[in-house]
Swiss-Prot record:
Keywords: Repeat. It holds the Pfam family FNIP. InterPro entries: F-box_dom, FNIP, LRR_dom_sf, STK_FNIP-Repeat. This is Putative F-box and FNIP repeat-containing protein L60. The keyword DNA damage does not apply. It comes from Acanthamoeba polyphaga mimivirus (APMV). The keyword Repeat applies. Disulfide bonds: none annotated. FNIP repeats lie at residues 87-128, 130-171, 212-254, 255-298, 299-342, 343-386, 387-430, 431-474, 475-517.
Length: 621
C-alpha cells in the first residue's frame, strides 16, 4: 500500500516540525491546504519580535518572544528582554517572570533590589559599567550566563554558584571567593592576582582581558583547554604555567618572552603569537601535533628546518620582512599558507607543498608566476597588493574555486586564464580592463569588479551563473536590459552611478539591492518586486522619494532623506528601517505596522517618544 504524507497522524508531523526552523514549518504548511490547520497546533522555537506576533491567534505557541524596552511598560510573555541604550528607569516589579534572557543597555544605572530580576532568568548582560551593588541575591540563582563590569569590589555570593559562563571586570585583585566553582567559561579583566584558589577546577575556557599582566605561577587549572592572554600580558613563562590539556593558545599584542622547551605543552593544536613577538624558536620547542601556527608582524627570526612540526596544516606569517625560507622549513603536509607582507625569494616548490588548498601570495611579491608553480591542490587563491603581472592559462590551477586579485592588478584577461572551476572572483582597486564574453567563465557565482572598474558591459560578459554582483566604486556605464543576468539575486551599484535605470535592467530575482545613489530619471517602478533588502542614497539635492519601494522590502536603509517622509512611501512590509540623516518628524507613516528596528539620528530622539511602548529596537549610532 502506498503511504502518502496525508496519512501521517498529526502528532508525527508536529514532531517532525521540531527539527525544522519556524520559516521552514510555515513553508511546509502552506504547500498543502490539509496542513494549514496545524498552524495553531505547532510550537515555534525561533526568536520572534513581539510586535510581529502578539496579535496572532496562536501567540501562545511562540516559545521565544523578543522585546526592546524603551520604557518600563513591558508586556507579559516576553522571554528575551533588551533595554534600549537610552533607558535608565526603575525596573522594580516590571520584568515579567517569563524572561529568560535579559540585557541592560549602556545608560542603565538604577539600583536593583533582590527580586527585581525574577528567578528563571538564565542569561544577563550589562552592556556598560554598572557600579551599584549586586549583593543580597540581586542576581538570581537561576542565572547561568553573566556579563558584568563594575568598578566596585564584589563579595562572596554576589555571583550565584550556578553560573557556567562568566565575563567579569571588577575592582578585586583577589577573586578566589568571587568566581563560582561551576564556571566553565571565564573572561576576566584588570590586573588580578592569581593564586591556587582563584580559578575553579573544571574551567575549560579562560580568556584574560586587555589589562591583565600578572604572573601565572602554575595557577591555571589542568582542565583548561582554551587559553587566551590579553594584549598587555608580557610575563616569562615556566614549565607547567600552561596546563597540559590546553588545545588552543593565543598570546596578545605585547607578549615577547623567550619560549623554551616544554613551556608549550604537547596538547596544543592551535598556537597564535601576538604583534610584538620576536624570539628565536628552536627545534623541539613547538609541540608535535601542532596544527595551526600564527607568527605576527614583528617576528623576524630565521626558521630552521624542523622548527615547524610536520603536523602543521595552517601557517600564517605576518611580518613585513620574512627571512629566506629554506628547504624543509615549510611542513610537507601544509594545507593553508598565508604569507602576508613580503617574501624575498621566488615562489617555488620549496615554499609551496603539493598539499596546499589555500594560498595567499605576499603583498609585496610581483614576480611572474608560470603555469605549474601553484600546486594543483589549491582551491582558494589570493594575490597580494602589488601583484600586477600578465597571467597565462594555467597560472591559476584548474581546481581553484575562489580567486582574489590585489590592489594593483590591472592586466587584460583572456578566455581560459580564469579556469572554469572558479566560483568567486574579486578584482582589486586598480582593475579597469575591458571584459569580453568568456573572460569570466560560466559557473562564477560571486563577482566583484573592483573600485576603479568603469568599462562598458555587453550582454553575456557577466555569465548567467552569477548570483552576487558588485559593480565597484567608479562604475558609471549605461546598463541595458540583459546586461545584468537574470540569475543575479544580490547587486551593489557604485557611488557614482548617476544614470537613469529603466524597468527590467535590475532582474526580477534580485533580493538584496544596494543602489548607493538614485538618479532622478529612473523609472518609477525600476526596483523589482522581489527585493527584500534595499539601500539607497537620495543625494544632496533635497529630493523626495519619487519612485516606488516594493511591498516585498523588509529591510530598508535610506541615506540623506532630508524632506519629510509622507504616507504610502514606506511599505508596511518593512521590519528594519534606517533613516540616519532624517530630520523630519517620526510619524505613523514611518513606524508603520511591522517596524521592529529603527535607526535614526540622535537629534531625532524626542521625535519618536510616542512609539517607545511598541517594543522597537531604537538605534542612534
Amino acid at each position: 500500500m502506498e503511504l502518502k504524507i496525508n496519512d501521517l497522524c498529526d502528532d508525527v508531523i508536529v514532531n517532525i516540525f521540531e527539527y525544522l526552523s519556524d520559516n521552514d514549518k510555515m513553508n511546509f504548511m502552506f504547500t498543502n491546504r490539509y496542513f494549514s490547520y496545524l498552524i495553531d497546533k505547532t510550537f515555534y522555537n525561533d526568536v520572534h519580535h513581539y510586535r510581529l506576533v502578539h496579535n496572532l491567534p496562536f501567540y501562545n505557541k511562540f516559545k521565544k518572544i523578543e522585546y526592546y524596552a524603551s520604557t518600563n511598560n513591558i508586556p507579559n510573555g516576553i522571554t528575551h528582554l533588551v533595554f534600549n541604550d537610552e533607558f535608565n528607569d526603575n525596573v522594580d516589579g516590571r520584568i515579567p517572570c517569563s524572561v529568560k534572557c535579559l540585557t541592560f543597555g549602556k545608560s542603565f544605572k538604577k539600583p536593583l533590589k533582590p527580586g527585581t530580576i525574577p528567578f528563571g532568568v538564565e542569561k544577563i548582560i550589562f552592556k556598560s559599567w554598572y557600579n551599584k551593588s549586586i549583593s543580597g541575591g540581586i542576581i538570581p540563582g537561576s542565572v547561568i550566563h553573566l556579563e558584568f563590569k563594575t568598578s566596585r569590589k564584589l563579595s562572596k555570593g554576589d555571583i550565584p554558584e550556578n553560573i557556567r559562563h562568566l565575563e567579569l571586570i571588577c575592582n578585586n585583585q583577589s577573586l578566589g571567593v568571587i568566581i563560582p566553582r561551576n564556571v566553565k567559561y571565564l573572561k576576566i579583566g584588570y590586573n588580578i592576582l592569581l593564586n591556587e584558589t582563584t580559578l575553579p577546577y573544571g574551567l575549560t575556557h579562560l580568556v584574560f582581558d586587555y589589562n591583565f599582566n600578572g604572573k601565572i605561577n602554575g595557577f591555571i587549572p589542568e582542565t583548561v583547554t582554551h587559553l587566551e592572554f590579553g594584549n598587555k600580558f608580557n610575563q616569562p613563562l615556566e614549565i607547567d604555567d600552561i596546563p597540559s590539556n590546553v588545545v588552543y593558545l593565543k598570546f596578545g599584542t605585547d607578549f615577547n618572552q623567550p619560549i623554551t622547551s616544554k613551556v608549550i605543552p604537547s596538547s596544543v593544536k592551535h598556537l597564535e603569537f601576538g604583534y610584538y613577538f620576536n624570539q628565536p624558536i628552536n627545534r623541539g620547542v613547538l609541540p608535535q601535533g601542532l596544527i595551526s601556527l600564527t607568527l605576527s608582524c614583528k617576528f623576524n627570526q630565521i626558521l630552521e628546518p624542523g622548527v615547524i612540526p610536520d603536523t602543521v596544516k595552517i601557517l600564517n606569517i605576518y611580518p613585513s620582512n620574512v627571512c629566506p625560507i629554506s628547504i624543509g622549513v615549510i611542513p610537507s603536509r601544509l594545507t593553508h599558507l598565508n604569507i602576508v607582507q613580503e617574501l624575498n625569494q621566488i615562489l617555488d616548490q620549496t615554499i609551496l607543498p603539493e598539499t596546499l588548498t589555500y594560498l595567499r601570495i605576499p603583498h609585496c611579491y610581483n614576480h611572474p608566476i608560470k603555469p605549474g608553480i601553484i600546486p594543483l591542490s589549491v582551491t582558494e587563491l589570493e594575490f597580494g597588493s602589488n601583484y600586477n603581472q600578465v597571467l597565462e592559462i594555467g597560472t591559476i590551477p584548474p581546481n581553484v574555486n575562489s580567486v582574489t586579485f590585489g590592489t594593483k592588478f590591472n592586466q587584460p584577461l583572456s578566455k581560459g586564464v580564469i579556469p572554469n572551476s572558479v566560483k568567486k572572483i574579486r578584482f582589486g582597486f586598480e582593475f579597469n580592463q575591458l571584459l569580453k564574453v568568456g573572460d569570466i567563465p560560466y559557473g562564477v557565482t560571486h563577482l566583484y569588479l573592483g573600485n576603479r572598474f568603469n568599462q562598458p558591459l555587453e550582454i553575456g560578459v557577466i555569465p548567467e551563473s552569477v548570483t552576487h554582483l558588485d559593480l565597484g566604486y567608479c562604475f558609471k556605464q549605461p546598463l541595458e536590459i540583459g546586461m545584468i543576468p537574470s540569475s543575479v539575486t544580490n547587486i551593489k551599484f557604485s557611488m557614482y552611478y548617476y544614470l537613469p535605470i529603466k524597468r527590467g535592467v535590475i532582474p526580477d530575482r534580485v533580493k538584496h539591492l544596494n543602489l548607493n545613489y538614485i538618479y532622478t530619471g529612473c523609472d518609477p517602478d525600476f526596483i523589482p518586486k522581489s527585493v527584500t533588502h534595499l539601500q539607497f542614497d537620495l543625494g544632496y539635492n533635497f529630493r523626495l522619494i519619487d519612485f516606488k519601494i516594493p511591498e516585498s522590502v523588509i529591510d530598508l536603509e535610506i541615506s540623506r532623506a532630508y524632506y519629510p517622509i509622507g504616507p504610502k512611501i514606506i511599505p508596511n512590509s518593512v521590519q528594519k528601517l534606517s533613516i540616519w540623516d532624517y530630520k523630519g518628524e517620526v510619524t505613523d507613516d514611518i513606524v508603520g505596522k511591522n517596524v521592529v528596528c529603527l535607526r535614526v539620528s540622535p537629534l531625532n530622539y524626542r521625535g519618536y517618544e510616542k512609539y517607545l511602548d511598541l517594543g522597537i529596537e531604537f538605534k542612534t549610532y
